[in-house]
């Protein structure tokens, strides 16, 4: 499988790149700077310098020709401000989908977040509200497309080692954290699961092995 990951230097992306490379997939990660390329090479991925906020649609689509699946793992990050929340978490996700459709890519997986429906809740700061709204807008755009999309909404992300055991379901799960290791494992499983097309799933730490959790979530949902 040939997979391209936007936000290829992110902590989930690097884990997913390694998982895919280890099983023999061809993996490319789009990164913002040449200084990040060595980190991708160390996990077995090919890094491509591509700023999603400035690249043209035609150039981005050209780089996706012949690709089997794309994963949107990019994000503006904490402290980036409301403007970049919109330009990256929404705008770049939309453009990546435009490019994938133009290139004929059959699958698009988006890493979103739990809690989108809470945007603007009492006591929530404006930047986080804008982040949730940007993610919600990106999700809505993707659902309206013909591409084979899947949206994964993990809970709060942790860097502690994953267990390989998760809880996965259609929205909405009780709010709970999940290790980035396990998010990457679930993404790999979803890439291999055609039945995940057109589904939105929420993910936390749990008690089911990843493959079983995916099977059950798709059967029930």
What spans do the regions from the language model cover?
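Core catalytic loop region at the nicotinamide-binding pocket of NAD(P)H-dependent oxidoreductases
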Residues: 190-214
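NAD(P)H-binding glycine-rich loop region in Rossmannoid oxidoreductase-like domains
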Residues: 29-95, 99-102, 191-195
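N-terminal Rossmann NAD(P)H-binding glycine-rich loop of SDR-like oxidoreductase domains
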Residues: 1-25
